[in-house]
């Protein structure tokens, strides 16, 4: 059975006799390649060749995501000015303009100024969303299928859910949280516009050939506390899932922050799985808490990324790998919560491959 077939069988809840090991090593590879610090063994390899050498599957968002196409109105114009490490993008629309400032390093980007700061900015963002269209690029999808082959099933992650998009992309945490209390009417309307505008995206995904759909939300309970989660996020999760399930899709969100306060709601959101729940010491939950909260909901990932740091005892990696298999298999796509660090020991990924190959399930 190929990794692709195994991947699909897990989400279709068909019998499986193997553990699917699907770590995300892309950031490790990209940073070390850019810095010239790839280990000698991998220096001449492509990313997929490294995956193959390590004996593991790939979670191929990066290959399939570009099949999602989002186009703004022709009357929207973006103007970029670069000054040293700072790039300033001014978005001009018939409703007004938005300004975003990013600071760049050789391997990363940080937002210095978010585009939405005032109620007037909210209205401009709403205009952009109301005039945006989504379509699926079949040619890109077919090329991605050829690139990935049998290494994994096709999958994508879709734009963040309402609150997480506001907190991470549009306003930032401080301004976004403040605005919810200072401008509740305007923020309620923005959330409603985001939800409605997402319908075009949901129709595009529902009509696409991709079966496995991730909600790339980066949920953290500090950004999305239970009262906010249950009021704005959970109802939209349920609505999205009903639409995509009717189209035969399998869904899961990306919860890579502290989520102990949100786990009690995990089974009520209508997901097939949940990705990237981060155990202690980096997150705030134990694997036992995750097991008890999820029931038969599929866990994607599970092994703390700290276990892949060179200074950490190898015994912890072995123990947590075996716990994940014991607690969650067959409802498991084993991975790293959230991904291996650029300074991680890549040979520990190979060790997990060997454990999975010998696992009796």
State the predicted function of each range:
Residues 47, 83-87, 140:
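Generic hydrophobic, aliphatic-rich segments that mediate packing or membrane embedding
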Residues 4-5, 62-65, 72-76, 86, ...:
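Short secondary-structure boundary micro-motifs
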Residues 75-131, 151:
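A contiguous, low-structure linker/loop signature
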Residues 15, 52-59, 83-85, 94-95:
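Short, solvent-exposed loop/edge-beta patches enriched in aromatic
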């Amino acid at each position: 059975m190929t990794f692709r077939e195994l991947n699909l069988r897990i989400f279709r809840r068909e019998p499986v006799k193997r553990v699917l090991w699907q770590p995300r090593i892309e950031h490790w590879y990209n940073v070390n390649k850019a810095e010239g610090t790839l280990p000698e063994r991998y220096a001449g390899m492509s990313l997929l060749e490294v995956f193959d050498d390590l004996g593991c599957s790939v979670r191929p968002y990066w290959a399939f995501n570009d099949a999602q196409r989002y186009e703004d109105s022709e009357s929207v114009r973006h103007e970029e000015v670069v000054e040293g490490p700072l790039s300033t993008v001014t978005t001009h629309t018939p409703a007004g303009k938005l300004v975003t400032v990013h600071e760049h390093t050789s391997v990363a980007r940080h937002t210095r100024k978010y585009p939405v700061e005032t109620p007037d900015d909210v209205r401009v963002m709403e205009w952009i969303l109301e005039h945006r269209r989504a379509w699926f690029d079949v040619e890109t999808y077919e090329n991605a299928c050829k690139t990935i082959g049998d290494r994994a099933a096709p999958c994508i992650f879709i734009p963040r859910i309402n609150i997480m998009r506001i907190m991470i992309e549009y306003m930032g945490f401080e301004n976004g949280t403040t605005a919810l209390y200072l401008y509740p009417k305007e923020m309620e309307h923005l959330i409603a516009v985001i939800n409605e505008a997402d319908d075009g995206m949901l129709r595009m995904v529902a009509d696409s050939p991709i079966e496995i759909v991730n909600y790339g939300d980066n949920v953290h309970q500090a950004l999305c506390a239970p009262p906010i989660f249950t009021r704005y996020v959970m109802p939209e999760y349920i609505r999205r899932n009903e639409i995509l399930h009717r189209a035969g899709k399998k869904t899961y969100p990306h919860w890579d922050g502290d989520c102990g306060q949100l786990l009690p709601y995990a089974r009520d959101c209508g997901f097939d799985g949940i990705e990237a729940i981060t155990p202690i010491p980096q997150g705030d939950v134990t694997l036992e808490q995750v097991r008890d909260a999820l029931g038969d909901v599929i866990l994607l990932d599970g092994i703390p990324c700290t276990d892949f740091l060179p200074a950490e005892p190898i015994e912890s990696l072995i123990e947590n790998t075996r716990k994940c298999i014991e607690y969650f298999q067959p409802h498991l796509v084993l991975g790293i919560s959230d991904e291996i660090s650029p300074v991680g020991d890549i040979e520990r990924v190979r060790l997990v491959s060997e454990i999975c190959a010998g696992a009796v399930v």
